[in-house]
Design a protein with these regions (language model features):
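Substrate-binding pocket helix/loop in short-chain dehydrogenase/reductase
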Residues: 4, 32-33, 40-43, 137-140
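Short, small/polar-rich loop/turn modules that mediate ligand/substrate recognition or access, typified
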Residues: 17, 108, 113, 170-172
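Active-site loop-to-helix junction immediately N-terminal to the catalytic Tyr of the SDR YXXXK motif
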Residues: 36, 82-90, 102
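Active-site helix of classical SDR
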Residues: 56, 92, 100
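Alpha-helical segment proximal to the catalytic Tyr-Lys
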Residues: 61, 105-109, 168
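Residue(s) in the substrate-gating loop at a strand-loop-helix junction
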Residues: 76
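Short C-terminal tail/terminal secondary-structure segment
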Residues: 81, 160, 171-185
């Protein structure tokens, strides 16, 4: 927790305020459920969910001064749909989405809007760690109604919208950016 406090102290010292905090932490052990160990669970939950709670607290302390701010987390469709080898990450991202709702309610009186963006499969370096990478890519291309895979820009556009004044009354929501893929599951 000290590193989190140090990070936000540095933001405060440099800028004196915080308008938007993007929580894009993501890591996890990709194995079948029966092969998971306690250390895998703890590692993934700490990075993906626990960090949001404590970083969100520190971000909110800075945002309260201006009585405004946006906290936006990145999630994954694995939070609502089964993905092979994705147990720890999927469950941790479900925790991120739940925590998003709790933060949204408790931070609303301070003018802070909290939301999340959940993405479909994106071909990034992280995808190379999936043991079933090729099957995931094939599925994403062939079964996405929009006819193409999601790109990082698709997620960025959703985050930019949530960070804008146009989204001030959106609170505690997870915006799904998947080209319609989860509609077919």
């Amino acid at each position: 927790m000290e590193k989190i406090k140090e990070l936000f102290a540095a933001v405060d010292a440099e800028f004196g305020r915080l308008d938007v905090f993007i929580n894009n932490a993501a890591s996890g052990v990709l194995r079948p459920l029966m092969e998971l160990e306690e250390s895998h669970w703890d590692w993934t939950m700490n990075i993906n969910a626990k960090a949001l709670l404590f970083a969100g607290q520190e971000a909110a302390k800075l945002m309260q001064r201006e009585n405004s701010g946006k906290i936006i987390s990145l999630s994954s469709i694995g939070s609502i749909r089964y993905l092979e080898n994705y147990t720890t990450v999927g469950v941790s991202k479900a925790a991120v989405e739940s925590l998003t709702r709790y933060l949204a309610v408790e931070l609303a009186p301070f003018g802070i809007a909290v939301n999340a963006v959940s993405g479909g499969l994106i071909e990034t370096e992280a995808l190379n760690h999936f043991p079933n990478r090729e099957a995931l890519l094939e599925d994403a291309v062939s079964k996405t109604p929009a006819g193409r895979m999601i790109t990082p820009v698709d997620l960025v556009n959703a985050v930019l919208f949530l960070a804008s004044d146009k989204a001030d009354m959106i609170r505690g929501q997870t915006i799904l950016v998947d080209g319609g893929r989860t509609l077919l599951v």
